[in-house]
Amino acid sequence: MRVLPATLLVGAATAAAPPFQQILGLPKKSADTLAKPLHDLQEQLKTLSGEARHLWDEVASHFPNNMDHNPVFSLPKKHTRRPDSHWDHIVRGADVQSVWVAGASGEKEREIDGKLEAYDLRVKKTDPSALGIDPGVKQYTGYLDDNENDKHLFYWFFESRNDPKNDPVVLWLNGGPGCSSLTGLFLELGPSSINEKIKPIYNDFAWNSNASVIFLDQPVNVGYSYSGAAVSDTVAAGKDVYALLTLFFKQFPEYAKQDFHIAGESYAGHYIPVFASEILSHKKRNINLKSVLIGNGLTDGLTQYDYYRPMACGEGGYPAVLDESSCQSMDNALPRCKSMIESCYNTESSWICVPASIYCNNALLGPYQRTGQNVYDIRGKCEDSSNLCYKGMGYVSEYLNKREVREAVGAEVDGYESCNFDINRNFLFHGDWMKPYHRLVPGLLEQIPVLIYAGDADFICNWLGNKAWTEALEWPGQKEYAPLPLKDLVIEENEHKGKKIGQIKSHGNFTFMRLYGAGHMVPMDQPEASLEFFNRWLGGEWF
């Protein structure tokens, strides 16, 4: 069987994945490790229905030049685990689970829900002066360990610059799937960026200006995280996030009492509905979840894929990138694409969802990608294809690969990479890409506010598609929300008071924002506007 690389939604950006690695080039032991899953994949294909086999055959016939290699599976990252004596604190999940309290009826019950026995949290107070990143701000780094499954997730916590005793706590997630949230830290919204001299530069518009922020490298084998196993779908990753937050707030109860929010972008449009639902499913928890924020996310493919042609062909507020012939070819491909996504939604079967992802990405994203235009920002060309179009991403990777940086934060892997393409392919071949995670959003809206924001120059997760899926979503407030017009969003304070930074519509717990002049990474392109809406959202202005 031959398969095709999918388009990659990195947390901060999106690009075509590089060619697959030839498994014959791997060490013999690694090749043997891959043999069984590839054999199982071939065997499963033999059992498919005629319709499902036809979908796979059709994808191969439409894109013969790209269907060159079998999928690969992620290999363990080289690492050296630090001794327990290195860490200031180790929080044992088993200890948390052993705490019983009297319930409302007098019966004993666990103080905190969830299966946490296999998890530990390692914590180290990081010296800010060692790296020069936000000196004076309290920082913690460490790992969440799933000892049962050999998974180790890296996190980096920055306390609020303002009033950490009262300011909210935010978890930030980049996407991919398979891209490090440290990209968001140093390229977008963290306390420092990295310049061309590979030195940290203070960020005046950091999101920890009025909130404490946790940056989490997930799933495993992303960034500084590592494992001997692999995670290949969003649901599995959600269990780890719940464990991390539970143990972190157990160690630091002073933060647990604050409001907590989850924010992320791109493939976090998949992650966040699942992660938030996982948290809310535990009635006895120490996580004070108040809202979620999704920026330029992929959440409802069936609706969003309608809007690649309009965005590429001049209907999104920017000049057309494609000629009429290419626009027509995208129109011609759309009905088949939507039919395949509908089949994926109806079955949620990997054998249906995988070909839908491959066909639709190539038919509707391919024409744009072939122009060389930046898929994250319709206003310009891709400046550095080796770093997903952004030179700054290369600076971040070079910085995080420095030995002194890895030592300062307690990283245990031998090297850092911004995106792990094996993880991306694992999620793709598990069918995760097209699955209907938007169906979880109505359940969230019953309990917490949801913000969908989008930079209006992004192509890959464009504002047209994000606005459309929020309007198409079936929830009790749909009839009131959907027809609402967009209104001006302006800066309320400082010397730029009254400046228009975007548009907004909001009803009940649901809010959509269009941010002017920003691509896929809103905080990078429009830092002032980004911090403006972020602070006002956390302040509860729209809910």
UniProtKB/Swiss-Prot annotation:
Pfam families, alphabetized: Carbpep_Y_N (PF05388), Peptidase_S10 (PF00450)
Record has Protease as a keyword: yes
Propeptide feature: residues: 18-124
GO biological process: proteolysis
Glycan attachment sites: N210, N509
Main EC class the enzyme belongs to: hydrolase
Subcellular location: Vacuole
Cysteine disulfide partners in this protein: C179-C419, C313-C327, C337-C360, C344-C353, C382-C389
GO annotation, cellular component aspect: fungal-type vacuole
Enzymatic reactions: Release of a C-terminal amino acid with broad specificity
Principal subcellular localization: other
GO MF annotation list: serine-type carboxypeptidase activity
UniProt-listed Enzyme Commission number(s): 3.4.16.5
Keywords: Carboxypeptidase, Disulfide bond, Glycoprotein, Hydrolase, Protease, Signal, Vacuole, Zymogen
Domain of life: Eukaryota
InterPro entries associated with the record: AB_hydrolase_fold, Peptidase_S10, Propeptide_carboxypepY, Ser_caboxypep_ser_AS
Active site positions, chain numbering: S266, D458, H520
Family: Belongs to the peptidase S10 family.
Its job: Vacuolar carboxypeptidase involved in degradation of small peptides. Digests preferentially peptides containing an aliphatic or hydrophobic residue in P1' position, as well as methionine, leucine or phenylalanine in P1 position of ester substrate.
Name used for this protein in its record: Carboxypeptidase Y homolog A
Source organism of this protein record: Aspergillus fumigatus (strain ATCC MYA-4609 / CBS 101355 / FGSC A1100 / Af293)
Lineage: Eukaryota, Fungi, Dikarya, Ascomycota, Pezizomycotina
Gene this chain is encoded by: cpyA
